[in-house]
Structure formats: C-alpha cells, structure tokens
C-alpha cells in the first residue's frame, strides 16, 4: 500500500480553491460535439433532450466534490487526484500506474494528433456570458471532467452506461438543465437572401428524414451560413480603382464570374470610346489679336478626354444622367456684336480716327465732332491774330479830358517761379487776345452805364486809343503763368473796380487842369526775366546781384534817379515830390487836381556816358537816403489820412530782411514797386500792419558801389585761399577744408567765423583794407545761394 500512495498528490480541504489553467488545444466542432466530416446534404434538427443524454450520464457517474478544482494531469500520468476528505481513485488510473509508462505515451500521442487535426480547421470563438452563476461553472467543470474521463475509461465502464443514463435523465428532469435565460432576439435583423428554395417533404419515411434524425447538432449550424448560388450571377459594378485591393481574398474569386466580367469590360470600353468622341468639347476660338497670333504656336492638348472613361464607369449604365435636348440651330446666324479686326485693319482705322483731347465732362457730352473741330480752329485763329497784332493786348480807355493806359500785370506765384527753362529764363506762354471779343465790349458798355448814374465815379467812353498815346510793345508786356491778370493804371487817382472776370481796372476822376509836362512811365521790372534784369543793371554800369528782388529795387532807383520823380498818389493822401525831398509832407482832404499821363519809352541800350551819369546819380540818391529818413518820422507823425490805403509803399533796404516774408509783405512790395515816388517816401497808413524795424549794421553805411566792390573782394579772397598744411599730425587727421571747398560741399558756413577770416586773412590776399560785418557776409551768401547760419 505504501507504493500505491507514493505518487499520490494530496490536497487538503482547507486550502483555497485554485484556478487551474485550461488546455490551449483548439475547440473544434468535432471535439465539442463529436461531429463527423461535413456532409453535402443539410441535416435535420434534433431535440435538446437527445443532445444532452450522454452528458447527463457522465455527470451521474463522476459526481466530483464541489470544493475540488479541476483535475490536472502532472508530468507523471499515473498520479491520481484526491482530496483529504474522500480519496477517489479510479480503476483506470490504478491500472495505468501498474502497467508503466507505455500507456502514458499513447495518451500523449493521442493529444498531439488531435491538435494536429485541428490546425486545418476553421477556428470558432466561444462566447462566455457575463451573468453566469457559480452553479453553471460547476456544471461546465463536471462536463469537462466527464469528457476527459470518457477518453480514459475502459470497457468495464461502458457496460454501466444504460444505468447511468437513466439516472442522469431523472436528475435533469427534476432539477432542469441549469441554463441561463436566453437573450431577447432582435426582430429587425436583415434576413439572409434565400438563394436556394427550401424543400420541405411531408413524407416521414423519406431518406432525408431518416438521415436528419441521425445527424448531430453541428450539422444544424450549417443552415445559418450564407451560401451563394453560383448559377445566378450578380451585376457587378466596376470599381473606380480598377485593381483589387490588398485585403481582397483571392480564394473567393470564382471562374464563372471572371468569364462574365470580361465581356462586360469590353462592352464598357466601347461605350466609353463613343462618349469620348461625342463629348469632346470644341475649342474656343480666340477673340483677341494676341490669342489669334499665339494660337498657331500652342501645343495640341491630348489630355482632354483622358478622364471621361472613369467618369462614365463611375456613373454606371443604370445611373446615366438624361441627356439634355440639343437646341436646334437656326438657319440665320446672328451677326456678332463686336467685329474683331485684324491688326492691319485696326491700325488703319486708328490712323483715320481724329483724336480729341478735353476734360471728361467735355468728352462725355453728346456734341458732334464738328463742334470740337470748330473750337480748335477758333483757338488757332485767335493765337494767330495775337501774334500778328501784339498791340491789341492792351486796353486803352480815353475819357473826355484825360486818357488812361491800362496794361496787364500779374503777381508772382509758385507756378511763375517754376516756369523756367534750363538757362533760368521765364518760359514765355502763348498770349491769347481777348480784347476784341464781344463779351468785353458788352461788359464795358454796362460799366459805363453804371458810372453815369454814380456822381462820384468817372464814366468810361469808347475803347479807341488816341493818337497821342503809344500802346505798349509786346516786349514790355510779359504775362505770367497765372490765368488772371491785373490792369494797373498810372493815374493821379486810381480806384480798383472789376471790369471783367480776368481784368481789374483803375479809374480816375477827370482833372480840371491839363498836364503841363508828360513824364515817362517807369517800366514794371517785375515782369522782366532774370536775364533781362541783369542786362538792364549792366546797362546802368552796375554789377548784377544774384537776388531778383534786389535787382528790381536797384533798377527802380536807377530809373528814378535818371528820369526824375513820377507823380503818384495814394487814396485821400495829397503829397508833393518837392515837399517830400525837403522833408515836409502835408495831408489834405481835397482831390488831386493835376494828373500826369506817363508814356513808355522803348527799351534800348545806353551808351557808356549815359550809364556812368546814371550810376553817379544813383550813388547820390543812395547817400541822401539816411538824411531823408530822419525827416520821414516827423511827416509820419503829422499824417492823419481819412481812409486807409489799399497798399503801402515799402522802402527796400540793403539791411537784414526776413528770410521768409509774410504774404502781406510780399503783396505790398509788389504793389509798391510801380508806385514809388522817391526812395525817401514811406507812408504807413492807419489800420495796416506795422513793419518790423530793421536793425542797423555796417552794411547800411556803404553805398551800392562799395557793396559791389566788397562782394567781389569776398569772392576773390575765397578762391585765393590755400589749404593749410598739417605738420604736427603727420597726415593722420583729414586735411582742413578751405572756404571754397566747404561751399562746394554744401557745408553750412558759420557767418561769424567767415567774417573773422575775411577781416584777418582773406582781404589781405586781395589787398583790401576795409572790413565787413556779419550782415554783409550773410547778404553775400544769400545772393550766391550759399548755405549759411549763425553760431549756436
């Protein structure tokens, strides 16, 4: 007995329950249900009681302890499994232990053969229910034990089967199958396609019925598999990819379907070729000149119908869109709205076209082209008349007793400054004569009627010039680029009244006395160009200064010193030229009785003798200026004008002036340039803005000739300066620039340093003994266009 229990494994009852690992052998239908190989005919279903008869008998014979785990076969197959309470040793295990290891080897070989058989079978999953009770687990465990013990039982155990089956049937009928309640079945499943009609035979003695009675539960599962009838070929829609995918199972491809697919593909390719030809879109004809020329060299597009085949296959035969009904082409073709001409025809029509230039509002009008042509002809005709009759560019109105000469003048502006050529001369615009137009005649007639009604205003008579008055020449009248022009008169009593939109006239009352002496009229130097002003200054024997304003002032003084004083007057101010020179001025409320009509003399070059005499007279007037200014202060204090003047006479000095004068100052200076009596007169009426007093410096003590000589000495001294040598630095520092080099480099000149250098070193180079101040140096720099500044 000792040898009997040497290899026995004892498991005490108090030990915890152990979960033994299950076998990993494949669970095939033949192993679970004892199925035979599949038969072609479907078996009939069996009753559940017959299926579980064998299981019940095995459970009744074994009856394992509820606490014992599943039996596990150790490496030694002869070891039986027992518990401490009830040791159960089967006869089969005892016989195998006595016989030796030969029987165990056969058992191992049987297991390996079974696993090899299951390798070629389809694996089926086993569904475990989550709500299984412990009681169901015990039943499944007993089933497995019964299955293993069935394979190991001998012929002696087979004799006891009828008795065991009967006992098991009684237990099942009393206790039930211990199965879990089945889940509720869904009613909305899609039923499988009835490929083969089910044949139901009512004959109980048929061989199929007998065969179905003998079939097991495994054969009934074959009816739930989907089986396709190969005879019925389905309409297969071609895929867009054209090739099988990677996951397609090639085992399912059948030969019959492949044979039917080939003619279908051939048919579809033929249809696609037809649609390729029919649906090829016609090329759009070029509609531009560039497209017409480049269409000849463009490559032919061969990829137009490549994607038609895929689109047709994707749509399929059953999903073709209905073709749109084609519109019937009318027999009469419509003419195109815009006919595209060839390049030659377009160029020809372009040459025949008359281009009309004008503003947008003019071009948008519906006027005929002849209107524009007539307008252009009228403009050309007026230009030709202006060139032929330059004397018509002035308007002369002659009252009964006196005559008034009116001429065009204009104010300076940015446009007039910009209208210059490369040589600095003012660009001469074309002069359009508007004096003979009927609009001005009507305006003058209306104005004369108004003047007759007014008692204090003079009347205008016919616009015919008298023989005694010479019209202004074309050279003396230089209009600026501004569209409007001022008409100024050199009368004894001017008043500004607008005659037309572009003409301002000056009227005067008829005088009671006839003029005894006719003095020449001082020309308007504001209308001269820079070149003409320089020539005029040189004709007086003086050197021209760079600034235009100073040239005009110098010419005014020279002309007054040569021709004497011109009698001019302001509104409500009675002055006399002799009283102004002597330093006395009186103001009266009476009107000026004697008027003088000035006559313009033709401009001509003067001889050297006349120019020297004019220069001496100019020097004399300039020297007398400081003495006259002292007497002016007393005259200004005594003056009490009744009405404020529309302009003021401003004396132009050589002293320091504003860099950017105000607009009022510019307007006053322009108006006073033609109305100055003497350089000594300076009327400052009430209500006008006071002028900033100019500071006196060294420059005011020099006369014009001295100033010109000093300025020429400054220019010569700058050019004679040599660059100083840097002996101590040995060339490490950059060389010091001369004043001339600084000027060329546009470097700002410090006026104090420059004046100091001139007084110490510069004038010594040109043998000049006099000295200059900062104001004179600044005047010279500004006249030459040199950038200068004071020391900060």
From Swiss-Prot:
It is found in: Nucleus. Residues 77-88 have a biased composition (Low complexity). The keyword DNA damage applies. Residues 92-104, 669-679 have a biased composition (Polar residues). The keyword Transmembrane does not apply. Residues 59-173, 254-287, 484-523, 593-697 are annotated as: Disordered. One of its GO terms (cellular component) is Slx1-Slx4 complex. Residues 158-173, 258-275, 601-613, 621-635 have a biased composition (Basic and acidic residues). It holds the Pfam family Slx4. Keywords: DNA damage, DNA recombination, DNA repair, Nucleus, Phosphoprotein. One of its GO terms (biological process) is DNA repair. It comes from the Eukaryota. One of its GO terms (molecular function) is 5'-flap endonuclease activity. Phosphorylated in response to DNA damage. Residues 650-659 have a biased composition (Acidic residues). InterPro entries: Slx4_ascomycetes (IPR027784), Structure-sp_endonuc_su_Slx4 (IPR018574). Residues 276-287 have a biased composition (Basic residues). Belongs to the SLX4 family. Forms a heterodimer with slx1. Regulatory subunit of the slx1-slx4 structure-specific endonuclease that resolves DNA secondary structures generated during DNA repair and recombination. Has endonuclease activity towards branched DNA substrates, introducing single-strand cuts in duplex DNA close to junctions with ss-DNA. This is Structure-specific endonuclease subunit slx4. It comes from Talaromyces marneffei (strain ATCC 18224 / CBS 334.59 / QM 7333) (Penicillium marneffei). The lineage of its organism: Eukaryota, Fungi, Dikarya, Ascomycota, Pezizomycotina. The gene is slx4.
